[in-house]
């Protein structure tokens, strides 16, 4: 058996040493290379580092050197997956990493390339605890519009030409060539940036006015290695041709003539348009007048119909009021519920507001905040109607409330809290205390208010006895005893001192409810309202506060209230 050659063993050992101490990541020849990508296209940036076979990539990061913050990356690849953390906001969702198996490396793809993406990119590769980085450059390029050539002017045998184009990046360069293909000298070059950061270019040159053939303008984009060319044909001049001013005049005069003809045509057209517009406006006005007449007739018919309906409603309300009066009851006031500032007559049918509180027992039934009083009657079934004389009072509250309403403290009056009330707030302004409140006006202010309760039907209606009209109706399903409610309200600077008076008998409407002087003959069937003498002189009555007196002229007014005989 032959022994191995010492030289062969040495060679194997050297190769093993090279393999062991060879770095896992090596630099390719692509380091520092410039890559070009069209605007809004996809850029491919190969990482200039490659891995030895069987080496496992731990992490790869792409950075923009010089961009802050340094910790944010363009793309992060770690543990075999793309990562979203620590990414620059402008690159999120636009990058991807593709494996280049041929070079044992990776390619960074940037979609929808922008001008701001151009510049230096750094690829950093980690294998275990070892890392290495190197750079590549991205250049963004845009091929602009086709060049446009036009004659800028004429000057002493020369024709000055201007070549323009827009939408280039990076800055292009322009080349003029004459009819023989020779390069022409550029007279001026202007390059500017538009709002999108792309270059506009305008380059001028000139040729002799006796030149014949094509003149071309070529704009080059060196980054893309592409160009765009436009040519202009120069015609042959005739012998003895006119001078430049004559040529200009020969061009200007026909154009001026065309402009004059065009102006005349436009004036005639505008005149016809105005006439047509005036005719259309006249027709529109005529149609509007006709429509107005029709609408006026329609509104007249509608108004006539509404008046008829209103007349029927008034007749129905009048009939309802007359039926309600068939259920008249004599209501009295309950002194145990009266607020301490209220003063009641001895027969408990009149109530007014005093100047101070009376020393009365603070029983549970008495109102201590709301200046009100309830009727003595409890209604749990049937129909009931009563009338209250309000006279010239400017404020009052009348209606019905549940026996269970709170008597202590401030209470919001509403059907939900067991109150079905109507209030005169000021002048001819009235409110039904619903939730929210319902405001309305009356054609004639009532001197006497009728209140009708139909317990089973769940109806509480208010009537103006003065003109026999309906005021307001509440509807509700009642389940507890109901009682009449009275509140004379504050004095209103002395204009509201008159009392609320419960009528002992039905009152006539219109003139008969106005108090008459004593001594005049009464109408047939009329009787005087019977009043207790203590109403005029309340001293000594347990229902009045000492030194509080009723007005001296109240007696004749109360005696003048008339009621019809039924």
UniProtKB/Swiss-Prot annotation:
It is found in: Cell membrane; Cytoplasm. Keywords: Cell membrane, Cytoplasm, Disulfide bond, Glycoprotein, Immunoglobulin domain, Membrane, Phosphoprotein, Signal, Transmembrane, Transmembrane helix. It comes from the Eukaryota. Expressed in spleen and bone marrow. Residues 30-139 form the Ig-like V-type domain. Residues 1-29 form the signal peptide. Glycosylated. It is a single-pass type I membrane protein. Residues 311-509 form the B30.2/SPRY domain. Belongs to the immunoglobulin superfamily. BTN/MOG family. Possible role as a cell-adhesion or receptor molecule of erythroid cells. This is Erythroid membrane-associated protein. It comes from Mus musculus.
């Amino acid at each position: 058996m032959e022994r191995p050659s010492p030289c062969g063993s040495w060679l194997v050992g050297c190769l093993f040493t090279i393999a062991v101490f060879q770095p896992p990541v090596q630099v390719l020849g692509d380091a520092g290379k410039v890559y070009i990508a069209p605007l809004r296209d996809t850029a491919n940036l190969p990482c200039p580092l490659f891995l030895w076979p069987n080496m496992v990539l731990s992490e790869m990061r792409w950075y923009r050197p010089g961009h802050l913050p340094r910790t944010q990356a363009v793309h992060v690849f770690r543990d075999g997956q793309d990562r979203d953390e620590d990414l620059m906001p402008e690159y999120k969702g636009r990058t991807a990493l593709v494996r280049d198996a041929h070079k044992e490396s990776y390619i960074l793809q940037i979609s929808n390339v922008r001008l701001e993406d151009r510049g230096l990119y750094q690829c950093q590769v980690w294998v275990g605890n070892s890392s290495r980085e190197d750079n590549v450059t991205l250049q963004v390029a845009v091929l602009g519009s086709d060049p446009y050539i036009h004659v800028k002017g004429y000057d002493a045998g020369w024709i000055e030409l201007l070549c323009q184009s827009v939408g280039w990046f990076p800055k292009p360069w322009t080349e003029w060539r004459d009819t023989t293909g020779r390069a022409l000298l550029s007279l001026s070059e202007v390059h500017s940036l538009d709002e999108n950061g792309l270059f506009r270019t305008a380059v001028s040159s000139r040729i002799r006015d006796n030149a014949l053939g094509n003149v071309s303008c070529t704009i080059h984009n060196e980054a893309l290695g592409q160009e765009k060319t436009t040519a202009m044909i120069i015609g042959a001049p005739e012998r003895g041709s006119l001078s430049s001013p004559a040529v200009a005049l020969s061009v200007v005069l026909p154009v001026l003539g065309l402009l004059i003809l065009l102006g005349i045509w436009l004036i005639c057209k505008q005149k016809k348009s105005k006439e047509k517009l005036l005719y259309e406006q006249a027709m529109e006005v005529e149609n509007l007048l006709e429509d107005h007449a029709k609408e006026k007739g329609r509104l007249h018919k509608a108004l006539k119909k509404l008046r008829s309906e209103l007349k029927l409603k008034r007749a129905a309300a009048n009939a309802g009021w007359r039926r309600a009066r068939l259920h008249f009851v004599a209501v009295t006031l309950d002194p145990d519920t009266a607020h301490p500032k209220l003063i009641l007559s001895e027969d408990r049918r009149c109530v007014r507001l005093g100047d101070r509180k009376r020393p009365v027992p603070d029983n549970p039934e008495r109102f201590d905040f709301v200046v009100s009083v309830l009727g003595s009657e409890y209604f749990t079934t049937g129909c009931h109607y009563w009338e209250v004389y309000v006279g010239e009072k400017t404020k009052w509250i009348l209606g019905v409330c549940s026996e269970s309403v709170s008597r202590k403290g401030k209470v919001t009056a509403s059907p939900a809290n067991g109150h079905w009330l109507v209030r005169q707030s000021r002048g001819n302004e009235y409110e039904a205390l619903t939730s929210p409140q319902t405001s309305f006006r009356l054609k004639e202010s009532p001197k006497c208010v009728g209140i009708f309760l139909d317990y089973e039907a769940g109806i509480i209606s208010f009537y103006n006895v003065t003109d026999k009209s309906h005021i307001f109706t509440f509807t509700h399903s009642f389940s507890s005893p109901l009682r009449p409610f009275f509140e004379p309200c504050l004095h209103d600077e002395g204009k509201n001192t008159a009392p609320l008076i419960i009528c002992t008998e039905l009152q006539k409407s219109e003139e008969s409810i106005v108090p008459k002087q004593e001594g005049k003959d009464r109408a047939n069937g009329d009787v005087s309202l019977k009043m207790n003498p203590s109403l005029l002189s309340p001293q000594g009555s347990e229902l009045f506060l000492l030194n509080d007196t009723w007005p001296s002229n109240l007696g004749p007014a109360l005696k003048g209230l008339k009621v019809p005989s039924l």
